[in-house]
Each structure stands twice: as C-alpha cells, then as structure tokens.
Amino acid sequence: MSEMTPREIVSELDQHIIGQADAKRAVAIALRNRWRRMQLQEPLRHEVTPKNILMIGPTGVGKTEIARRLAKLANAPFIKVEATKFTEVGYVGKEVDSIIRDLTDSAMKLVRQTEIEKNRFRAEEMAEERVLDTLLPPAKDQWGQIEERDTNTNTRQIFRKKLREGQLDDREIEIDIAAPNIGVEIMAPPGMEEMTNQLQSMFQNLSSGQTKKRKMKIKDALKALIDDEAAKLINPEELKQKAIDAVEQNGIVFIDEIDKICKKGEYSGADVSREGVQRDLLPLVEGSTVNTKHGMVKTDHILFIASGAFQVARPSDLIPELQGRLPIRVELSALTAKDFERILTEPNASLTEQYQALMATEGVDIEFTESAVKKIAEAAFRVNEKTENIGARRLHTVMERLMDKISFDASEMSGQNVIIDGDYVTGALGDVVENEDLSHFIL
C-alpha cells in the first residue's frame, strides 16, 4: 500500500498529466485516506468507509490516464473496467460480480510477487545448491541413499565461486523442475466464468506437484530454479488470505464510461445493460459479500472511482441510489490550445520525445522548434472545434499526419538532422486543417 502524501501523489501525476488539478487532488486525498484508515484502531477503522468519486469531463482530457497512473502509484489491488461490458444478472453477458473476482485475481498476482521477492534470497541460495548438486552429485551409501551433503569441500567452494562469477553460465546441465500446469482453455457462455474457473483449477490441480527433466544453460537454470524454490516457500492458503485482505482493505475499482449506462428518455421495458447494471452495481458499491474462487470477499471498504463524459446523459440520470454512493464529484475541464502545447513537451515520455526516440533508432535526429509545437497544438485545437472534440487524442492523429513522410523515408535518411519548424507544420497540415471536409475524414 502506498504511503505517499497527497502532495507527492499530485506531483507524480503532474509528470504525466497536464492540468486537471481538482481531479488529481480528489484521487490523491482518496488514496491517502486509505493509509490513514489503516492507522486507526479496529472498532473505528471498520466504520470509516471510502468516499467514492465520480469524475465528469469530456473525452480525452485525462480521466482514464489518471486511473492508469494511479494504479502504478497505489501499490494495491486495482482494476479498470468498462461499464458497458456488463448486463443485469440473469441475462447473457458479464455480471458485475466478476469485477470483484478479477480484482481478487489481480491481488493474488500482486501478493504472490511480493512474497516471491521476500523469499528471493533464500530461494537463490537453494537454487545455487541444486545447481552445485547437479555439477557435483553427492555420494551415495551402500543402500543407495544420498549421504549428507558437505557444503564446505574445497571442490564445491571452487565451483561455487565460478558459478557466482558467471564463469559457468553457458555450460549445459539437466535439472528437475516443476512441470507447468496443464493449460485448458474452456469456452463458456458469458456469465458462466465462475464455472470455467473451477474447471480450469481442477485440471491444474491434476498436474501440480509433478516434475520434469529439462536441459538448459546454467544461467537459465538458475532463474528457473529460483522461481521453483520461491514457489515452494509460499503457503498457498496464507497467500489467498493475504490477497483477500488486500482487496477488502486497499482494493480500488475504476469504472469507465459510466455515463453510457444511464437510462435514455422515457424508455420503458427491460433495460438490462443500463439501469439493470446500475442496480447490480449498488450492492457492490454499498458493501456486500462476493464469492470468488479464492474465498469470500467483502466490498465494504473497496474504493470505487467512476468516470464518464456525460455529453448526452447527465450525472442526475444515474439512479438516485447510485448517485448517493458517489459523493465526491470532480469536473475535468476541456483542454485549450495552451494545454496541448504543454502536453506535447512537458510530460515524461511526451509525444515529441516518443517520435524523436523512434526516429533515432534509424539514425535520424529530429528537432521540434517552439513555433512547430505551437502550430501543432493550434491545429489539433482547431480540428477539435470544427469536428468532434476528442481532446488530447487528436494530437496523436495530427502528429501521425505530420510525421508521415519522415517516418516513411527514415530508413534512407540515416545521419541526417531534421528540424521541424512552424513552416514545416503549416506545409504538412495546412490544407487538411483549413478544409473542414478533409478534417472530418483525415484528422
């Protein structure tokens, strides 16, 4: 679980997302409150529930990107889902309970990785001994039983030194490692994922505990044996319990496109993929118990962050009960031409940096002048105004159009230095930006 302060979280998000200070503050406070709650004593800790967030803003302004970056910072079980993928219980399609099942699977991977890292030192020692046993087989007594290994013999120490220095890396040995689980792909109708999971687990259990002889280089054998030994040091039942605790106490669910499940107009009848989904989401957000293959998971303290453009629907079109479960509302503002300029240059791995790095692989040095960046930003902003406003995603389209010729010829331009200035941008984009019909089809 992340122990970063709200200011540190916002500072980290600032490196990747331009503007949207209110949204960054809201998620930073929510993430910090997870840590604060865990510092409380038990009777009070249980009463403190997370304040779920609803992010409202046009497409392409950073809602999903905030979630993506938050997942990396949180160091907690995290899952992002599209609200449109689900249907009401009893109809064909995914049930909302599968969100918690997927979140628990994600927690299992996270906790397993943490446990492996904790035991890595011991696993490395044991893997080293197994490689040395293969290189220098221990003596057997008259009954064929292996005598106690002498780890301090001179020869063994010489081989240990060579092994640690990498002198034996390319030597081939034959080792016994755990056989991979049988991968059985079962195609089942939507909504029956739980049954397929149980069948897959059953087939995997049939093959667990079996070993397989493999011939490989010592350097690869060490990696395989370290993973093998680390897996043996992990208690599966303890792992499941830790994963369930991580989900219940620190889990975060990001529900995108929630505006697409709002009821439209005075439509009457079974609305299984809209209002029905909202009704099914209610118990999850409010707090219920979901049965997963790892055990029962309570959702009382899972943080839910929902987002939507709300261009056709409004937040008030959500059913009142769900509105009440999303008390924190954050509006993200539409991006200006100035924001586009900053997006092109300021974030880590900005778009201009990406294109420079891609062309550098061909030996072409690309330089974007300030006037070029300004013209690109203006072009993207104008096309957004004239046609559909898709936010920062328009920059990808404009940049691809701008770099089209250089990208095609780059393999024959090795060693050249290309300066992209305002005139170059006008020449490459001018006609398309000015002609509204062309903008519709090309940008």
UniProtKB/Swiss-Prot annotation:
GO BP terms, alphabetized: protein unfolding; proteolysis involved in protein catabolic process
Subcellular localization: Cytoplasm
Alphabetized UniProt keyword annotations: ATP-binding, Chaperone, Cytoplasm, Nucleotide-binding, Stress response
Residues of the signal peptide: none
GO cellular component: HslUV protease complex
Main location: cytoplasm
One Pfam family recorded for the sequence: AAA_2
Function: ATPase subunit of a proteasome-like degradation complex; this subunit has chaperone activity. The binding of ATP and its subsequent hydrolysis by HslU are essential for unfolding of protein substrates subsequently hydrolyzed by HslV. HslU recognizes the N-terminal part of its protein substrates and unfolds these before they are guided to HslV for hydrolysis.
Recorded family membership: Belongs to the ClpX chaperone family. HslU subfamily.
Protein's UniProt name: ATP-dependent protease ATPase subunit HslU
